[in-house]
Amino acid sequence: MKKHLTRLLFAALLLLALCIGASAAGTSGKCGPSAYWSFDSSTGTLTISGSGAMNDCVFQWGDPDPRPWSAYLSEIKTVVIGDSITKIGKESFSSLSCTTVRIGKNVQVIGENAFMNCTSLTGDLVIPDSVTTIDRWAFFGSVISNGTLTLGKGLRTIGERAFTDCSFSGGLTIPEGVTEIAEGAFCSSSKYSGSPAHGKITGTLTLPSTLKTIGAYAFAYEGFSGELLIPDGVTCIGANAFAECDGFGGTLSLPDSVKTVGEWAFYQCEGFTGLKLPAGLTKIEKLSFAFMAGLKTEVAIPEGVTEIGEGAFECSYMPSVRLPSTLKKIEKQAFMHTHNLTKITLPDGLETIGDEAFDGCRFKKAIVLPASIKSIGKKAFYGYSYYGSGTLGAYFLGAAPQIVGTLNANCSFPSDWTLFYLPGTSGWTGDTYAGYKIAPWDGETRWDNLLTREFGYGWDNKGNEIETSWSVNTDTGKVTLTDDLNEGCVVAVSYDAEGRVTSIGVLRTKKDFVILNLQDTCRLFLLNASSAPRLNTPITINDYLQT
């Protein structure tokens, strides 16, 4: 009997020891060669102590959560990484509902997916100066409500999508020493996901002088404001790098160190008012500067550029573009609907104009095509808006090129245009070419879409009705009335809001116009004279200067 009681007592003690051991193992344990974890359920605090690197916690599809603290995931509110820990393991704290993360002062590496989708963080997140590497997807989808992100001075590597879809305020400063922003490092998809968990970074963006490469989608769709200063030394800006960052303002000035600007790089950056391109470019990529609706100054495309890509400046609103002498090809839709362009000079050496390249533009001067042109695409100038009526057309300096869009079949030009050619150039035979009317020209006189009509009726100073016609040279500002008018003939000029001449003609009725100015024997008239500005550029009417 005594022996039996002894056995029962031993079994009870063993069971008690096992229970105590199991309880202790459940709230603490090892998580690295010399790293340990403990969870305090009363405060919801998970603490990583010890030293060195943590183990990686790599999830396998269908397997249980490999993290030793997996039983407490929903209870963890605070994560504290001890000062002697050097590496945070892969996926260690992903998808926690914690509100606070404190990273120890000797951590050097934050592993892949370490804090991915921690959407309940509040306050400020500080990455200490000891951290040199933030691996890919480390903070992907994490939200810092009403808080800021501070990146430590020792940081050198920011991995692919490290902070994608993060949300925090107060701006972002990338520390000196970082040479590359990896693909999608700070990208936001909130615009397309519709999820508030997919946040944006707000405030200013400061880039380091050490930066060399800005990866694809690096800052795409973010909510930055202020000016964007790209440091001298950056050589590559990846595709979509700043796409739809419409909060930036001022002039976007790309340093001459930049050799490559990827497709869609600054697509729909509507806040920029100016654009300076680097001297080292050889191609303007597809949609790289499209939909920059805020542009207000001329864009000069640098010498050395041979090709302007598809939609490169589509729907951007710069008032003028300067094309380089090295340009060979303008791809489809490159300048489609750039409504503020009033004129463009196509350089000698240009060979190809793609489909819809200038579709919907509103030039006020005639199009002159250099002798080098070999091909003009479908609807290249279709939808071209002009002011007034008359013999409108394109003026060719060389042989007849391939015109892909024939009349009434994806027209390359508006159907009422005439194609003017220089006598002696090849390919221009008969009365039509590609279905369009053709006619010779002298190489100088052009219809420039400034006149409301080519002839008109008016009144001389004695009340006699007269008829006249005219020609215009907009390069010199001289208008020539081709008929010998009586002394004192009345001439009317109309203006746009900026004081540019939009039409010139002879008066139909005396009472409909108000005298604005009188020079010698010619009178200058203007409709709605009370709101009319003065001319920006003087014009000459039959050698009488009008200002």
PLM regions and their residue ranges:
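Bacterial N-terminal signal peptides that target proteins for export
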Residues: 1-9
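Bacterial N-terminal signal peptides
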Residues: 10-19
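Sec-dependent signal peptide cleavage junction
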Residues: 19-27
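Transition segment at domain starts
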Residues: 26-30, 449-474
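Structural signature of tandem-repeat unit edges
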Residues: 45-51, 73-87, 97-109, 119-133, ...
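Consensus positions within tandem repeat domains that build extended binding/scaffold surfaces
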Residues: 89-92, 111-116, 135-138, 159-162, ...
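Leucine-rich solenoid repeat scaffolds
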Residues: 288, 377-448
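Short acidic/polar inter-strand loop motif in beta-rich domains
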Residues: 528-537
